[in-house]
Amino acid sequence: MAAARAVARDPGAYARQPPSLRAARLPRLLFLLAVVAAVGPREGGGARLYREGSDAVWLLDSGSVRSATGNSSAAWLVQFHSSWCGHCIGYAPTWRALAADVRDWAAAIRVAALDCAEEKNQDVCRTYDIHFYPTFRYFKAFTKEFTTGENFKGPDRELRTVRQTMIDFLQNHTEGTWPPACPPLDPIQSSDILSFMDSHSGQYHAIVFESNGSYVGREVILDLIPYENIMVSRALDTDKAFLGTLGITSVPSCYLIYPNGSHGLVNVAKPLRSFFSSHLKSLPDVRKKSLFLPEKSNKEEKSEVVVWKEFDRAKLYTADLESGLHYLLRVELAAHRSLAGAQLKTFRDFVTVVAKLFPGRPAVKKLLETLQEWLANLPLDKIPYNAILDLVNNKMQISGIFLTSHVKWVGCQGSRLELRGYPCSLWKLFHTLTVQASTHPEALAGTGFEGHPQAVLQAIRRYIRTFFGCKECGEHFEEMAKESMDSVKTPDQAVLWLWRKHNMVNSRLAGHLSEDPKFPKVPWPTPDLCPACHEEIKGLDSWNEGQVLLFLKQHYSRDNLVDAYSVDQGSPGEWEAQGREQEEGKGLNPSGKSWRHHDTGSLRPPHILGPRTDLSKSLHHRLDLRLQSPQGPQALKEAKAVVPFLGVGFSSLDMSLCVVLYVASSLFLMIMYFFFRVRSKRWKVRLYHPAV
């Protein structure tokens, strides 16, 4: 087991062992790794930023967010985040600390998180209009109608600020939506306090005196929600004479009425919320009560084991570029229900640049070119995202186009699943585009971008500003672009500009929680990759930018692309994985439909699918399986709708519409023919012969 852990901790250690030793240990290591994978959790192996059991954060997903926030007896504060977003990774400790800090408030308001990076959650994130990460939404208690929530409004996202805005949000509840477990948060009057002193209720009653802008009293009230035999209220320091009779000389102060009717000041070392709450919780007979909360798992979920792929850092891997395109087109873009106006133009320009300059495999390049031509010729100002998805998924079964349907990081893999990945692949794609524009400027001929050295950079800039999920990352890139992008005058300068800015980002993020310890963010290329790129001037390490440019053009060239680990168009693993996902219900949106085309074979070019009769048999086989399901007749209707007509890929509904359109067009032409025939008789010139 120790050997297996060592391999998992240092993937390169096994490769450094002598061949004879590796051969001797290989069977035992493979067995141990299989056992470890079966056992489950691996330290730091999970891609989620928050974990059931170990964190106080309530974890939601596409199947639970509506039921949790809809008509709930408590309010909710939900963070919609992405596990690859650097800012989300950096903010995760604050969110965990907040959830732990207000754990006792759960009967009134709960702190939750939903990961939009998971493909199964992409539809629900689009439904809630989540375009950037992290996004914070409040949901009121007892909300019967569907709502996307209220946006967080605060000067910053520090723990104290968010905690105080949670209190403000609670106080905005009306009487009909007030969480029943939440005590009153408004201040009481001096007369109320006097009546409490005379009532002898048989339980403790604490009153926190504070200034008008203080939150200490309300925080203590919420801290004591789960405790019985005590009641907490707050009062303002406006009645100075009354405070003097109670012996209160400063605020905040806590005054306690005991069950026997006696009363006096609470003596604590510091007038802080934690001191007041701790003292009140420790009083005799004050104990936690049973609260009926939704079931929350205390079991730590199993994490996926990272399967390491050996790779050469001097190479560029097709799998990284294609996985990035898959995530961009099928997940990130899915946050937008439709594209119109400036958004559509930004996407159209970006796709044009990628389609013309992408140096990858022909099937992927053809898909991008097909998408670009379709967008360019589309006479619409607004298009739904699903139309783009249908083309990317090759719903019309166009021959020879393909894009992998899942991510497989190689040069962008991280030591943990949430590290590197998509942001790394985007950087590689952007560098590749600038290099290809410099080395093959003729590729942009006829696009309107030819002769514009900033064209690629501007397309990248607008894409990041409009679509990239990490809002803070996009803002930083926009700042860099405003600062110096206008200085780019040649395609070579564009290559170097992006390289410099990438190194600036690495320098800023060095030591950040999003940094992978196995891939430290250091100036790139490192001396071992490009010795000629580094030189010493007056004792300082400096860049030889001429050599850097040569290195970048070589590194991001087509000749340096490696297809190892890339999914083949006819790869059984690709389609077996999709079949398993369909059977197990993985990757489904809340409505139960897969994000892929119903016919998984439609992702494969027809010449790989085999004869059309095989396709029809496959569809009818799936139809038979669905007829055996509980859905019965409804499944029959749905399945019939996707059976190709005459093997062309059109459904029966499509063909019915075509027939109706054909008949209507014929009738229209016939009517127009007879109309003009009659009119033409009136237009004929009649010749009259003069009478003699």
From Swiss-Prot:
Keywords, alphabetical: Disulfide bond, FAD, Flavoprotein, Glycoprotein, Membrane, Oxidoreductase, Signal, Transmembrane, Transmembrane helix
CDD domains, A to Z: PDI_a_QSOX
Gene3D superfamilies in the cross-refs: ERV/ALR sulfhydryl oxidase domain (1.20.120.310), Glutaredoxin (3.40.30.10), QSOX sulfhydryl oxidase domain (1.20.120.1960)
Catalytic residues (positions): 85, 88
Cofactor binding summary note: Binds 1 FAD per subunit.
Region spans: Disordered: 568-607
Known cofactor(s): FAD
Catalyzed reactions: 2 R'C(R)SH + O2 = R'C(R)S-S(R)CR' + H2O2
Protein name: Sulfhydryl oxidase 2
Principal place of residence: membrane
Biased composition (Basic and acidic residues): 577-586
Disulfide topology: 85-88, 116-125, 412-424, 470-473, 530-533
Thioredoxin domain: residues covered: 54-172
Gene Ontology cellular component annotations, sorted alphabetically: Golgi apparatus; membrane; nucleoplasm
Glycosylation sites: 71, 172, 212, 260
Single GO molecular function: flavin-dependent sulfhydryl oxidase activity
UniProt record similarity statement: Belongs to the quiescin-sulfhydryl oxidase (QSOX) family.
InterPro entries: ERV/ALR_sulphydryl_oxid_sf, ERV/ALR_sulphydryl_oxidase, QSOX_FAD-bd_dom, QSOX_FAD-bd_sf, QSOX_Trx1, Sulfhydryl_oxidase, Thioredoxin-like_sf, Thioredoxin_domain
Residues that, per the record, bind FAD: 420, 427, 431, 472, 476, 499-506, 521, 524
